[in-house]
Amino acid sequence: MESKEAKEKGVNTSDSKGSQIESSISDLREKSQHLFGVLLEPQVPVIQYGLNQLEEKARNLESKVLLTRDGDTKAHYLLAESGMNAEQTRQKIYSIHIHSPWDQLELDKKSLYEQPHTKLYNGQNVVASIENGYQSNVYEFQLRLMKNNGIAWENTKTEFMEDVGKLLHSKDNSGLGTSISMSLRPNLARPLLTASSVKSQSVRSLREVGSNLPIPTGSLTKIDGLNNQLSNDLTRSQTTNIFGFAEKASSFAAAVHKLNEARIRNQACHVWSLFASVSQMVNTEVIQLFDAWSLLAHMIDETRYGMGDFEARHLALDSSSAALAVEKNCIEGSLKYLENQFLSLIDLHLSDAGHITTVNSVEKVIAYSKLRFYKNGSWIKSTVSVVNDVPLWVVLFYLMRSGQLDAALQFVNTYSDDFEKLGRSFPLYFYSYAKNPSLPLPKQLRDRLQAEYGQLMKYAPEDPFKHAIYKLLGNCEPHRVSLPEVCVTSEDYMWIQLMFCRVNQNDVIDSNGGQSTNSLFNLYQLEKKIVAFGPRYFNPKNNTPTNYFLALLMCGEFERAISFLHTNYPVEATHFAVAMAYYGLLRTKNYEKNENILIYEADDVKINFPQLIIAYLKHLEYVDAAVYLDYIACIPLVPAYQACSINLTKILLLQSHEFSKFLGDIKPDTERTTGLLDLYLRLIPFDHDSLQKLYLEGAREADDDGRFGDSIILYHLLGDYDTVIGVAIKNLSQSIVSRGLWSIDSKESKNMHISSNVVASEAPDALAANLLAMYESNPKKSAKVSATNKKALKVLLKVVKVQKLYGQEKWDEVLQLIEHLDLLPINEVQAEFEPNEQIPPISARLRRRAFEFSTFQDEVLSVIPSLMYISMSSIKALYRTISKLPVVNEESKKKLQRLQFKGSMLVMFSTMIESRLSPQILEYLQAEQLTLL
């Protein structure tokens, strides 16, 4: 027991000791932490300012101290004695504030302590500013990228639009689909336009050699031949059907050239056929553009009408005879075109379906009607009226739609009983309509028909084709055309609308029943309707932009049609405008220098024809200047633009610098050859004063640019032959100087302007010699050339000969010719070789020659340094040759003395005219003269 108690007591003792140890350890830990904190606690509070904060605090303290100080008193007295106001000076000094780049980064320390959340907001602002900077940089990069890409895009925009226009062509259009877009198929008939009609015309170019064309009034000579021919002719062979912009433009340019050839010859030109043949060749994927030429040919018969026949249209009112003639041609031509198109479509569908083509029109249309509405042994349209397996109203409508009115009348006669059952008075209506379909029915019949039509509309449904026929016969509700089962294509819609149009012939209309002209649906109202619909109505799928163009043509809106087509097909639009201007179909406006092709005036629109041509010419690059002239010559097709064409021709001539091509070249008999401008005077009517101003302006510009060949031609045309020789002198002088003082190379300077005309292609010395010979052979023209210029030119020609002899190392001949020129005093005779006696008279002679030197022309003076160099070099070479002879006799010694004398004279003379010589020449002459001693 005791042992057990002892054990328990021992355990308790050990537990108490353990708890004491643990408490002491915890106390020590707590005390040590407290001691650590006491030791680390600073005696002064920790400064919570950074360096920038300390700097700002110091500035604040400094400002407070400065406010309490009044400065040094002695300094005040000292400054006052010197006349300075200390207070004002101090204010001026403290008013100066030098901005530090770190000022904007200083923070308000007080607000930072008082408002701790401000720091968070500032951080957010920094992040936001970084994000904004990043976004702005990205935006600027995108703009720069788009701009750089846009440069290349603008350069190829036209060609791209041409390719896009091809891709927009519908690939799945059917002849009679549900879409309202026009679907003109390549297989459709295109009468009046054949390639043979173009190929049969002469293909000889105005630029061909030997082309016999009559010379227009104002031309100086007959045609000698022109060397340039259009690079791409209309009949050239092509290996591909896909034409780019350049190929297309060159083909149309050839056609425009043929048009101008016909105009110059005063011959008629079949413009529609001419341009259509090009369109058929280059627009194989956009066949509607070719169909547009066919449509225009139906409107304006090119075999009947000629250039400017409808010119009065744009000057007259809409009720004038010229305007009414165009309106009538538009209606009748468009209807004929659409009817022929539909008839060809019938043949195409029957052929595709394997039907045997029949000559009988009625049987053909019946077969086509069954092909459309008879499927799998039953009629697919329950509203179609079928009698004896023949859909009467369908067949009759299609006969009318295809323009076969005689066949339609025969069909009504054949089925008259059946038609009477379906419409009691219908045969009577149709017989009256067939007599003159362009006029309304007599009033009595028209009232009866319109009453039946009202009942037909009231108790619908009826056969939709019967509805359409009644609507056409009675001219019922022409402003409302809602026949979706009949007008399945835009062609159908335009055909019905055009059938409603009537020409406002008041006397004819009133005598046939008194129908008011105000109730007629005329072409003007159709124009407004089509324009109000806009292109989206005729091109809902955005795949055939030419549909709206064709619709505008059909209603006579030629100006809007050209402007709309120009967006996607600028090449075709330009040539459509040229062809229309040929016949006078365009309403134009006085030329204004703006970029608007279409100009709106109240309810009318007019086209800026010159601007259209200029816009097209801007797209042409690397083409012959004659191509530009061809298009400029088309501008006077509108007579009001003759002055504009003259100004554009001046600009073309002055910028192209091809004066010999346009104005002719000089022939050996001093006359000139015929230029292109002579041939085009019938098209671009330059008068004599305008030509003289053009010659003078071009000559001055050529002088400034250093184009001596052009300058010579233009001054020759002006009749200023003395100036011609003066220009030749200047040209020859510069050629001599450009060869250099130390070189005998006869190559022309690289800095000289090169002209493409015949005059400038000759060497300057040959040109000058030819001009001098030509004028001297003609006494009248020679009298107009001054003797001074003749003498100067002859002197320069001899200098050229001196250079050639010098290059051949013919030293004796060089010195003899220089002595003959008498420009340098090396031919002074030495009577006695006594220097002391001869110096005074020789010195006097040299002074006299130096005085004469100042009277020379500048062109002659400029070659003197080169001539002095050649003289001294020849003297030196000849002196060395004689000195190296094995035996030097008395005659050789005299030659050496004469050479020494010539060298001395040359050096003495150079010192008298040293102001006109370069230091290099003077040093060379003096150095070489020493070698002769």
Curated annotation (Swiss-Prot):
Residues 1-10 have a biased composition (Basic and acidic residues). The modification Phosphothreonine is found at T217, T221. It is found in: Nucleus, Nuclear pore complex. Keywords: mRNA transport, Nuclear pore complex, Nucleus, Phosphoprotein, Protein transport, Translocation, Transport. The modification Phosphoserine is found at S219, S237. It comes from the Eukaryota. GO terms for biological process: mRNA export from nucleus; poly(A)+ mRNA export from nucleus; protein import into nucleus; stalled replication fork localization to nuclear periphery. Residues 1-24 are annotated as: Disordered. One of its GO terms (molecular function) is structural constituent of nuclear pore. Pfam families: Nic96 (PF04097). Its main location: nucleus. GO terms for cellular component: cytosol; nuclear envelope; nuclear periphery; nuclear pore; nucleus. Residues 11-24 have a biased composition (Polar residues). Homodimer. Has a role in promoting mRNA export from the nucleus. Belongs to the nucleoporin interacting component (NIC) family. This is Nucleoporin npp106. It comes from Schizosaccharomyces pombe (strain 972 / ATCC 24843) (Fission yeast). The lineage of its organism: Eukaryota, Fungi, Dikarya, Ascomycota, Taphrinomycotina.
